[in-house]
A protein has these predicted regions:
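C-terminal non-catalytic alpha-helical accessory regions
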Residues: 66, 216-218, 530-684, 873-874, ...
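Gly/Pro-rich turn-and-neighbor structural signature
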Residues: 215-222, 292, 302-303, 328-449, ...
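Extracytoplasmic
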Residues: 719-721, 727-736, 741-1006
C-alpha cells in the first residue's frame, strides 16, 4: 500500500496527490477518516478520504505555513533531534555560503542551550551516526546537489524561488545514514531562514540576545516526519532603519563594541535574519559612516546575507557624512556637479559585488529639500547620471542592479506632479513619519515592473515633537496601514525606522512577520499575535496575561507620545479622565508586578525589558504629569494639598531617574547601559531637551488655621472654575443632572485651605439624596460621593440641596434631578452627551463584495471598524450600500453635533479626500470629507497635520436635528475604504472638554 503525500504550494493554490513509498509490511487493519480543509483561490473545499487498510508509514504529509513540527514526546517514526543519548549531529558543505555555515553553527549553539547536549558539527565529513541533520543551499552546496542527483530528496517547487526553504525528513539519504532531516534553501537566505526556523521551533527567540530572552529548556526534542515550508515571502525586501541613534544606541555601542563596527553589526544582522528580515539602512547620524567606520561592515553584512542600502537622502551607497570627509564642497548639483558625480562613483565602486539596493535621487544637505521649488527635470537628470555611473562601474545594464527611489517628504511633490522613474527602480512611498501612509499606487500604476515599497516609522525626530524614548506603536495600526499598502500592490520593499532597536522589539517582530505573510494575520488574529509573541519569549508562563499587558501599554502610549504629554493633557475636571488614565497604568503595573514576582529568575530580565519596564516608566511619567496638573489646579483653588502635589512631582521626577539608572546598571550587570538615556521630560520645541526637566510646580502659603473649600464633579461654572472658596464671592455651585436611567454617582470634594486639621460635615436636605459619608477630618482633601435613591425621588424635575459645614462656615450645593425621562433604549444621553465606540454598532449592513470588520484594540479607547476589501471602489450611499447603525436616546429635541473620532489617515488616493456619509434617522445623508482643508502638505508642518498626529485622532463634526425626544439612529455609510472609525460622541448641548472624549454611554436593550 502506498503512502499518500499531500502537497500544497506556498500560496495554497494547488493540490497534488503523489505516491511516495510502498509500505514495507502490514501491521494491522483499521479505519481512518482523514479530513483536510484547505484554501484554494479564496474558496474552502473539503476533501475527505476514507482508508480501510492500516499501513506502516515511511513518510508523512507535508505541512505548510508555520506549522509546528517539533514534539517533546516520542512517537513511532519521529526523528530524534536530542534525547538522553545525545543530540543528532549536524552536517553541511564547505562549498556553501559562509552565512549558511555560520547559521548552522548558531543552530549547534542553540541546541546546546536548549538541551544541554551539544551536537557534533561536521563539514564535508559524514558523521558516525545513523541520523543526521543536513543543511545546504540548492545549486551551491555540493552535498545538497549530490542528494538531488541521486533523487534522495525532493526539491519540487524550490528552484528559482526567493528565500524559500524546505525542511524534510528522508530515509537512507546517504550510505550509512538511516534517516535525516534536511534543510534545503532555494538561495542563501532561504537556507538560513530554514535553519533559524528550526532554532525558533525548539525554543530560541530571535530576541535571545537583544532582550535576554531565556532559551526554553527541553529534555527531549523530536521532529515530526514530513516536509515543511513557509513558502516565499510576500514582500521581497523587509528591513529596518537604525536612526536617531544618539545618545542611547551610539553610547551603548561605543561602550560595548567601540562603535558601530562589524562586531556591533553582527548582532544586528543575526537579529534581522532570525526575524526573517533581509534589508538594512544602517545608523547614519553625524559622524557615523557604515562603510568607513569599519571596512569590514559591508563585507560581514554580505557574508551574513543582509542586503545593504542607504537612507532617503544618501544616494549611491554613500553615507552623507562621507561628503564632509570627502571635502566635496557645496551639496548642490547645479553648482558642484563634477564633485558629486565623483563622490557617487566612489560609492558604487566600493559596493563591488556585495548584495545591495542602490538609493537614487537627491535631496538637500542634511535631510532637507534639494531646491525651493519642485525641480522635476533636474531630479530626472540627476537620476539618469546616477544610473549611467551604475552601468559604467558594474559593467552591466543599470537595470541589473537593484535600485530604489525614496518618495520622502518633499520628494512626493515630484511624484504628485507626474515624475516617474525607470521601470526597474523600486518606488519607495513613505508615511508622514507618524505612521500614516501618504500615498499608494493607483491601479493604472501597478504595471511598474519592480514595484513599490513603504518606509514606515516607529521612531521619529522632528515636528511636532520627536518621539524616541519608548514604544508608542500599536501593532493594530501597523496592521491596518500596511494591510492597506499590501492590498494596493505595495509588495517589494517594507522598511521601518526603529530608532535604537530597543525598545521596539514587539513592533519589529510584528512588522517582519506581517511582511512575510500578510494573509496569515487577519484583523481577528491580532489579539492572538500578542499571545503567540508572549509564548515565544516566555513560554507558557502567563502568556495570556502578558499579552494583555502588551496590548494595553502600547494602546495607552499611542494615545499621545510620552514626550508630548503635559500636565493638562488629560482633564482633571471632566469624566474623571486624568484619574482614569493614571489608574489604568497603575492597574497594569500591579498586574505586571504580580507576574514578575511569579516568574522564574531566568525569565525576569527579559520580562523586565519587554514588558515591565515600559509599563513602570510610563506609569510613573503619567502619574507625575497628572500630579503637576493637580498642583496647578489646587494652587489656584488655594488647597493645602497643592504643596503636597508639588512634592509628589519631585518624588516621581527623581523616580524616573532611578528607573533609568536601574535599567542601565542593575539589568544584566550593565549590559544595556545608556539604552534608556533618551530625554523625555520637558520638551518645549520639536527637539529633545538636553536633559530631563521637571514640570513646573508652585507652592502656596496656607492659612494657619483650617479653612473649608469644596468642588463638585462636573460642576456648573457660574463660579470660578466651578468651586466656591471663602472670600471669592462665588455663586454656590451645582451638580449636573442626576437621572434614573444613568443612575449617576458624582463626587463632592472637600478640601482644606489651611494648616490645621479640618473637621467637616455634609448633610443632605432631602431624604432621596444619598451620601457616601456625612463627616470627616482632613489634612488635605477627601471625596464624598453623591447618588440618588430613586425609590424616593420625586417625579419630574426638581432640585435638592446638600449643606457643607466646616471651620465655622456653611455652604449649599444644588442637586438637580430629572425623573421625567422618555422611554430609553440604545446608548443613553448623560447630561447632554451620548458616546459610543464605533465597534459597538447595533446593526451593520454588508454587501456581497464589501463588509465591515472590527480591528480589535485599534484606537485610543477601544476597538475600531473599517471596511474590507480596503481597495474597494467608491460607493454611493443608499439603502443597500454598506453602513453601520447606532441606536441612541436623547432626552430633548433640538440640534445635535456628531463628532466622529477617526484615525488620522491621509488621503492616500490623492484624489479628493476620503469620504463617508452620515445621517440621523431618515435625514438626507451628509457627505463628510475627512481630508477637507488639507491643502498644505504635512512635511511643511501644516496646522491640520500637527494637531492630528499629536492627538493621534482626527475629529470630524456634522450638524443634525433630533425632531423629538427619545430613540434615534445614527447611520454611517462607507463611501471610500481606508477610513478608520474609532468612536462617536453626540453633543446634545452638554459637551465638556476632554482629551479622549466622553466615556461610552450606558446601553439599554430595546
Amino acid at each position: 500500500m502506498a503512502d499518500i503525500i499531500i502537497l500544497f504550494d506556498e500560496n495554497l493554490t494547488g493540490l497534488v496527490l503523489s505516491i511516495h513509498y510502498f509500505a514495507l509490511s502490514i501491521i494491522h487493519i483499521f479505519n481512518i477518516v482523514l479530513i483536510i480543509l484547505i484554501k484554494i483561490n479564496k474558496m474552502r473545499i473539503l476533501f475527505a478520504f476514507l482508508f480501510f487498510i492500516g499501513i506502516y508509514c515511511t513518510a508523512d504529509a507535508i505541512v505548510i505555513d508555520s506549522t509546528s513540527y517539533i514534539s517533546t514526546n516520542v512517537s513511532e517514526g519521529y526523528f530524534t533531534l536530542s534525547d538522553s543519548n545525545g543530540s543528532t549531529p549536524l552536517l553541511t558543505s564547505s562549498s556553501d555560503y559562509a552565512g549558511v555555515i555560520r547559521a548552522i553553527e548558531d543552530l549547534q549553539k542553540d541546541i546546546f542551550k536548549v538541551t544541554g547536549r551539544r551536537p557534533e558539527l561536521k563539514i564535508d565529513t559524514i558523521p558516525a551516526s545513523s541520523k543526521v541533520i543536513i543543511a545546504g543551499t540548492l545549486g551551491k552546496s555540493i552535498l545538497i546537489d549530490t542528494l538531488v542527483k541521486k533523487q534522495a530528496i525532493d526539491t519540487t517547487g524550490l528552484t528559482g524561488k526567493w528565500e524559500k526553504f524546505i525542511l524534510q525528513t528522508v530515509k537512507d539519504p546517504i550510505p550509512g545514514i538511516e534517516s535525516a532531516v534536511i534543510i534545503i534553501g532555494s538561495d542563501k537566505r532561504g537556507t538560513i531562514y530554514g535553519i533559524y526556523d528550526l532554532s525558533e521551533q525548539i525554543g530560541v527567540s530571535p530576541w535571545y540576545w537583544w532582550a535576554d530572552v531565556p532559551f526554553q529548556k527541553k529534555d527531549e526534542i523530536y521532529i515530526i516526519p514530513g516536509t515543511y515550508t513557509d513558502g516565499e515571502p510576500a514582500v521581497k525586501y523587509r528591513g529596518i532603519f537604525i536612526n536617531d541613534e544618539a545618545p542611547a544606541l551610539r553610547n551603548w555601542a561605543k561602550e560595548k563594541f567601540g562603535g558601530f563596527n562589524h562586531k556591533f553589526y553582527e548582532n544586528v544582522f543575526e537579529l534581522l535574519l532570525r526575524n526573517r528580515a533581509n534589508y538594512l539602512w544602517p545608523a547614519m547620524w553625524i559622524p557615523t559612516m557604515f562603510n568607513e567606520d569599519d571596512p569590514l561592515n559591508p563585507k560581514v553584512a554580505d557574508e551574513y546575507g543582509i542586503v545593504m542600502s542607504t537612507s532617503h537622502h544618501e544616494p549611491m551607497m554613500r553615507s552623507h557624512n562621507e561628503w564632509y570627509r570627502f571635502n566635496g564642497g557645496e551639496w548642490n548639483y547645479e553648482t558642484n556637479k563634477d564633485k558629486l558625480l565623483e563622490f557617487w562613483r566612489g560609492g558604487i565602486e566600493r559596493m563591488g559585488n556585495y548584495e545591495s539596493v542602490v538609493t537614487v535621487g537627491m535631496r538637500g544637505d542634511g535631510d532637507e529639500a534639494m531646491t525651493e521649488e519642485t525641480a522635476v527635470d533636474l531630479l530626472k537628470h540627476i537620476i539618469s547620471k546616477q544610473r549611467k555611473i551604475i552601468a559604467d562601474v558594474t559593467g552591466k545594464p543599470a537595470q541589473e542592479t537593484p535600485q530604489v527611489w525614496a518618495v520622502y517628504k518633499e520628494v512626493q511633490d515630484y511624484y504628485d506632479k507626474g515624475m516617474r522613474v525607470d521601470d526597474d527602480i523600486i518606488i519607495l512611498f513613505c508615511d508622514d513619519n507618524w505612521g500614516n501612509l501618504r500615498i499608494l499606487p493607483k491601479k493604472e500604476d501597478l504595471d511598474h515592473k519592480t514595484g513599490y515599497g513603504i518606509y514606515y516609522h516607529f521612531d521619529y525626530v522632528g515636528a511636532p515633537v520627536s518621539y524616541r524614548w519608548l514604544n508608542t506603536t500599536q501593532i493594530e495600526r501597523v496592521w491596518e496601514q500596511m494591510n492597506l499598502a499590501y492590498e494596493h500592490g505595495v509588495k517589494d520593499l517594507w522598511l521601518v525606522n526603529v530608532g535604537d532597536i530597543k525598545p521596539m522589539e514587539l513592533p519589529i517582530s510584528f512588522f517582519m512577520d506581517f511582511a512575510w505573510n500578510p494573509d496569515a494575520i487577519q484583523a481577528n488574529d491580532l489579539p492572538n499575535y500578542y499571545v503567540s509573541w508572549a509564548k515565544q519569549q516566555f513560554g507558557d508562563y502567563h502568556a495570556k496575561e502578558i499579552a494583555e499587558l502588551l496590548s494595553l501599554y502600547t494602546k495607552y502610549n499611542a494615545r499621545r507620545t510620552p514626550e508630548m504629554l503635559k500636565p493638562d493633557t488629560y482633564s482633571l475636571k471632566n469624566f474623571r479622565e486624568a484619574y482614569r488614565v493614571v489608574e489604568e497604568f497603575k492597574q497594569l503595573l500591579e498586574k505586571s508586578t504580580n507576574i514578575y514576582d511569579q516568574l522564574p529568575e531566568s525569565h525576569k530580565s527579559a520580562f523586565y525589558q519587554l514588558v515591565h519596564s515600559p509599563i513602570e516608566m510610563c506609569c510613573n511619567l503619567n502619574e507625575m504629569l497628572v500630579a503637576a496638573g493637580k498642583n496647578k489646579l489646587y494652587g489656584e483653588q488655594g488647597r493645602a494639598s497643592a504643596n503636597l502635589y508639588a512634592e509628589k512631582v519631585k518624588e516621581l521626577f527623581f523616580k524616573d531617574a532611578e528607573l533609568t539608572r536601574k535599567f542601565h546598571e542593575d539589568l544584566e550587570d550593565g549590559k544595556w547601559n545608556h539604552m534608556m538615556s533618551q530625554t523625555h521630560i520637558g520638551y518645549t520645541t520639536w527637539n529633545h531637551p538636553r536633559t530631563n526637566k521637571m514640570p513646573a510646580v508652585s507652592y502656596i502659603h496656607t492659612d494657619t488655621s483650617a479653612l473649608l473649600g469644596y468642588m463638585v464633579e462636573h460642576g456648573l461654572e457660574p463660579a470660578w472654575h466651578g468651586f466656591s472658596v471663602e472670600g471669592q464671592g462665588c455663586f454656590s455651585p451645582s451638580f449636573i443632572d442626576f437621572d434614573p436611567i444613568n443612575q449617576q454617582s458624582y463626587y463632592l470634594e472637600i478640601f482644606n485651605r489651611g494648616d490645621k486639621t479640618l473637621d467637616y460635615s455634609v448633610k443632605a436636605k432631602n431624604d432621596w439624596i444619598q451620601l457616601s459619608k456625612n463627616e470627616g477630618s482632613i489634612q488635605y482633601d477627601e471625596k464624598v460621593y453623591v447618588s440618588i435613591d430613586w425609590d424616593k425621588a420625586p417625579i419630574g424635575k426638581t432640585t435638592g440641596e446638600i449643606a457643607i459645614t466646616g471651620a465655622g462656615k456653611e455652604y449649599i450645593v444644588k442637586v438637580p434631578v430629572r425623573n421625567d425621562l422618555p422611554k430609553a433604549s440604545g446608548f443613553i444621553e448623560n447630561n447632554g452627551v451620548v458616546s459610543f465606540e464605533a465597534a459597538n454598532y447595533t446593526n451593520k449592513i454588508d454587501t456581497k463584495d464589501i463588509h465591515w470588520i472590527v480591528v480589535p484594540n485599534l484606537g485610543r479607547t477601544h476597538s475600531s471598524i473599517i471596511v474590507e476589501p480596503v481597495n474597494s471602489v467608491r460607493q454611493k450611499p443608499d439603502n443597500s450600500s454598506p453602513r453601520v447603525e447606532y441606536e441612541f436616546t436623547v432626552f430633548d429635541s433640538g440640534e445635535l453635533t456628531v463628532e466622529a473620532f477617526l484615525s488620522p489617515t491621509q488621503d492616500f488616493k490623492k484624489h479628493d479626500g476620503l469620504k463617508y456619509a452620515i445621517a440621523i434617522d431618515d435625514e438626507e445623508p451628509q457627505i463628510i470629507n475627512m481630508n477637507e482643508g488639507e491643502i498644505i502638505p504635512d512635511y511643511k508642518y501644516a496646522e491640520w497635520w500637527t494637531k492630528v498626529v499629536a492627538d493621534h485622532i482626527k475629529i470630524k463634526k456634522s450638524k443634525h436635528k433630533a425632531d423629538k425626544p427619545g430613540k434615534h439612529t445614527l447611520k454611517i455609510w462607507m463611501i471610500d475604504p481606508g477610513i478608520v472609525f474609532q468612536k462617536f460622541v453626540i453633543d446634545a448641548g452638554g459637551q465638556r472638554r476632554s482629551y479622549l472624549g466622553a466615556p461610552e454611554s450606558n446601553y439599554v436593550e430595546p
